[in-house]
């Protein structure tokens, strides 16, 4: 009988398997070969060097990813898997052993002019496919530290930024507050924001604020320290600002970000009207209180077993495209999905490629509700993206954060739109539309407030240390600008900077705008599909395939979209405006 567990045999049958052992041994050999080739760069032609090093870089990528993915798959389904933890440590050490040699090769590639690169690659498909990869490597090298700077920075980061990250995680995971006689963690309290009982939601929010007040001091030190480290590192690397570095890593122009936020600001009043309408429907007159943002509305008695979920998803996706539906069918049929929650398995959901197999794996915690079906469809969208790029060269499979959620959000739009159109009652339709708008309003209003907060913090941190009260003031100002009169401003959450892990990374600053970009890009693509029909499909697949090789602007251009102007974003927001109008109509009827 199917127990809902994935099959990993296409990767490895175990850590003691011959294949796992041979791949570990081969990775060690590749490390040595890369080291040897790095010493031979001087005195050979660019063509000779590329022909010698690129295949090794490809093999290193394939081996290290396959080995580490298998460890991840094992660890995330069984936290007590000691063999997986041990193997993961060995894999990480082996994967990083060639870092210096790979850095030298990257610097060498960066030293070659574009003209010399073109001449060296001529007639070699195995090299010409990486023209854009080499371009990006040349750009990245301009921001590398000289001498032993990279090694020194990495070592200091362990006791610097990485330790401050751990402090924030430690404080937020350990703090508790009593609610109705029970000591609850911050995560447990935040999850009660979805409780059907309004009094529970309010009490949980008040307890949540008390948690933040207990830990705000050390977490403020963590935030200040991480941001100062990011600012200092950006100065050393030649970036104008922390945001400048973030956009560089995303392969995205500042004009595109400005166009996105410009369109969002135009439509903020529309989203404020959604919050006010929800507040009025729940009996509030001065806007929606913060603790009611996730208050459920409408209802549905519909539940799904995993076979019904499979049938529903495949049916909806087949309306759009046979290949997309077939990919989903195969994932179910060949046990690529670990379905149910169990002891030792992590929460949430993710999709990862199974490198070297042409497959992917999905972890989810399916509970039978429609939201769980949507989560499955979302992750299958990631899987479809992976299937589109699986034939790319090994070095052409990493895409940037802004486009990472495109296919997954597109799948969500397909599924939720179908569900709304086929709702069995107005109450079910209200639930579906309100859930969609909850997510959309977070992508627009909440993410914008996070962006404004981080931008202000980075600007102030250059010459001042911000105590908790100042950080709270910045957060409140950001929320007032983003949420306007849609929320009851006396109930705003000044401590949102404490709990959001996205602020606490020296590697990924401004881990916010990609959510807005991805969400609105997917909705805009869905609207384009509704207009173009079957003609849209080849462009959509080509766009997904090219995301690792092109900038976000050029990727979107394949579908005839200009993301550097406001018009496209206005179209996405206009579609959401129609959803808001439908929501208002339904709550008035109710």
Show the residue positions of the predicted features:
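Post-HExxH zinc-binding segment in Zn-dependent metallohydrolases
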Residues: 400-428, 436-438, 442, 518
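Short pre-active-site segment immediately N-terminal to the catalytic Zn-binding motif
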Residues: 302-306, 357-377
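C-terminal, non-catalytic "cap/extension" segments appended to globular domains
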Residues: 2, 105, 109-110, 135-140, ...
